[in-house]
């Protein structure tokens, strides 16, 4: 299993580091490293610190920040940028852009789990400019061109 350098920037997280909840978990929960409960009103976005910094270092990996399904479904709390992407050479604190798309004010308490992080492989490519593509059965059809059923 690859290793990633992790800095704990908030001492409260020393015993609550990102960890996989089950052997089959893809994501690691990120927590709100805030000092007091904060309210996020409907339609509002907030940048929430996680209290950790990481350095993936290896350009074959990136980290994706994704919403937690329960927060989105039950409370309308999703990511303000929909998906966060952390490049392998980033070394700063991880922040989560939290957006309340719901109709009720959401109260976020210190150390609440607010998002999940998934480490993913990355393939960097070189582009070759061409005049035409080799034909495929799909061609340039998009936005529903393959049907609904």
From Swiss-Prot:
Associated pathway: Pyrimidine metabolism; dUMP biosynthesis; dUMP from dCTP (dUTP route): step 2/2
Record Pfam families: dUTPase
BP GO terms, sorted: dUMP biosynthetic process; dUTP catabolic process
Positions bound to substrate: 68-70, 81, 85-87
Cofactors named for this entry: Mg(2+)
Annotated TM spans: none
Domain of life: Bacteria
GO MF annotation terms: dUTP diphosphatase activity; magnesium ion binding
PANTHER family listed in its UniProt record: DEOXYURIDINE 5'-TRIPHOSPHATE NUCLEOTIDOHYDROLASE (PTHR11241:SF0)
Name of the protein in its database record: Deoxyuridine 5'-triphosphate nucleotidohydrolase
Gene name, Swiss-Prot/TrEMBL: dut
